[in-house]
Amino acid sequence: MKNTIINLAQDLIRRPSISPDDQGCQQVIAERLTKLGFNIEWMSFNDTINLWAKHGTTSPVVAFAGHTDVVPTGDENQWNYPPFSAQIVDDMLYGRGAADMKGSLAAMIVAAEEYVKANPNHAGTIALLITSDEEAAAKDGTVKVVESLMARGENIDYCLVGEPSSAKQLGDVVKNGRRGSITGDLYIQGIQGHVAYPHLAENPVHKATKFLTELTTYEWDNGNEFFPPTSLQIANIHAGTGSNNVIPGELYVQFNLRYCTEVTDEFIKNKVAEMLQKHDLTYRIDWNLSGKPFLTKPGKLLNAVVESLESVAGIKPKLDTGGGTSDGRFIALMGAEVVELGPLNATIHKVNECVSCRDLATLGEVYRQMLVNLLGK
């Protein structure tokens, strides 16, 4: 299994699939799956290519989810090896996307292949949902596929997302949920004027200071047994023309909240509006909800994944809901149990991104064993 996974991972890495350009990665995957009798369906939206592949027609539906797109490489001269050469040095596979997430994608594909070869008449359905739009806008990828599947009554019961979840060793962390993410673009109005004549102007920065203090110090909740407390961070702030003698006419503040299941996006919006009105500010605010929080409590999927890690890798994982958002947030809307398990995340989005070849082989075995645990032999 190891050589098959590594060879496929190298093939995928050598395709410079900067989001949302798939560069033929999904075609390679589709051709492999077709040979095993998978039904292949292409769901393309705008510049994004999405693949929905299935083997079987009954319940439960066990899906693997992942993405073929990668982030830009940055200055390629800073890499020890060309970022799309997929070189292996001391058992480490180097390249953009090696850890995030072409390595785990290869492990998923080979695990599914091996399982189907051994169990051609398996129970349930094995599915793969693969997109080329995860790293950038994430507007035409998994979310659109999920919407299409739900519209025609298709469901997913269990889904493993191959995002790089591991911290210090393979399998030490399994993500069983994610916080929600909501961004506010706030415009506070003032009256522009000359700094020497402040009585003829109204400085929105000065007016907003007490509000900003309250916004950044407010305790939204205390978290719970599954999630850390909700946090807010100001990401961008701007006012003025660049001149030192002009009072700005508008203050722009962009802030983001990563929120847990103790609050809702509506509560957040209402509380911010309440603060703004309390401080008598004239404003406009635009909200962007990237995703609601989701949680998979201990059940069939988590048990299957944990048992696979213990039997194959000899490790009992920590369950965690921290970090950023993932496409799991869209799949959870289907009512599916969703967990994330993938390689180490220490080098993702960095120069010299890499993954252990040994880890990829182990990951493939873990994924295959998960299928055995859920669908039987």
UniProtKB/Swiss-Prot annotation:
CDD domains: M20_DapE_proteobac
Catalytic activity: N-succinyl-(2S,6S)-2,6-diaminopimelate + H2O = (2S,6S)-2,6-diaminopimelate + succinate
Binding site for Zn(2+) 2: D100, E135, H349
Top class in the EC scheme: hydrolase
E.C. designation(s): 3.5.1.18
Keywords, alphabetical: Amino-acid biosynthesis, Cobalt, Diaminopimelate biosynthesis, Hydrolase, Lysine biosynthesis, Metal-binding, Zinc
Positions with a binding annotation for Zn(2+) 1: H67, D100, E163
Names of the cofactor(s): Zn(2+); Co(2+)
Signal peptide: none
GO BP, sorted A to Z: diaminopimelate biosynthetic process; L-arginine biosynthetic process; lysine biosynthetic process via diaminopimelate
PANTHER family to which the protein is assigned, alphabetical: ACETYLORNITHINE DEACETYLASE, N-ACETYL-L-CITRULLINE DEACETYLASE
Family stated for the protein in its record: Belongs to the peptidase M20A family. DapE subfamily.
Protein name: Succinyl-diaminopimelate desuccinylase
Organism of derivation: Mannheimia succiniciproducens (strain KCTC 0769BP / MBEL55E)
Gene this protein is translated from: dapE
